[in-house]
Amino acid sequence: MFRIPILALTVLLCIASLSCQPYSTGLQQSVARADETAATAALRTIAVAQRTYSASNGGDFGTFQQLCEGGYLDSRFNSSKPALKDYVLTMEVAPKSEAQAEGFYSCNADPVRTGPQAGRHFYIDSTSSELHVNPGESATAKDPIAQP
């Protein structure tokens, strides 16, 4: 007599526990996508700041610290490797030379987290305003362009 309700309860508990996993994974991916949005917005802000800095500084590009000192970026970026949300930003800057009329910069946004809650890796540089994306490792100019 009690076997049927206990069996039904066991089946319901199994179904409930199985449905929690996809829900939790979905929440983790939602957080990663929100962090990606913040990272890509930061890279686009950096690109605008670099173009403005370059126009004011004879074709040279600036480091994070130089961009902050000049008022092109806010204090969140005033570090050699600023961290925004769950991303770390890194930038390389090369000055102009006799062989190169303009300087060069590249900037990466790499997630701090790993596993299913990690976001994608992004890249932008002075040759294009396009964001490049790589799902598993630091992105480069050779990676595909990020689609909105």
Task: Describe the residue ranges of each PLM region.
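Positively charged n-region of N-terminal signal peptides that target proteins for export
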Residues: 1-4
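Bacterial N-terminal signal peptides
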Residues: 7-17
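Conserved long hydrophobic alpha-helices within structured protein cores
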Residues: 9, 20, 83-87
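Compositionally biased regions
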Residues: 18-20, 80, 139
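Amphipathic alpha-helical segments typified by the pilin-like N-terminal helix
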Residues: 18-54
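A short acidic/small-residue loop/turn micro-motif
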Residues: 25, 138-141
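Extracellular/periplasmic head regions of type IV pilus-like filament subunits
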Residues: 28-29, 48-120, 126-130, 135, ...
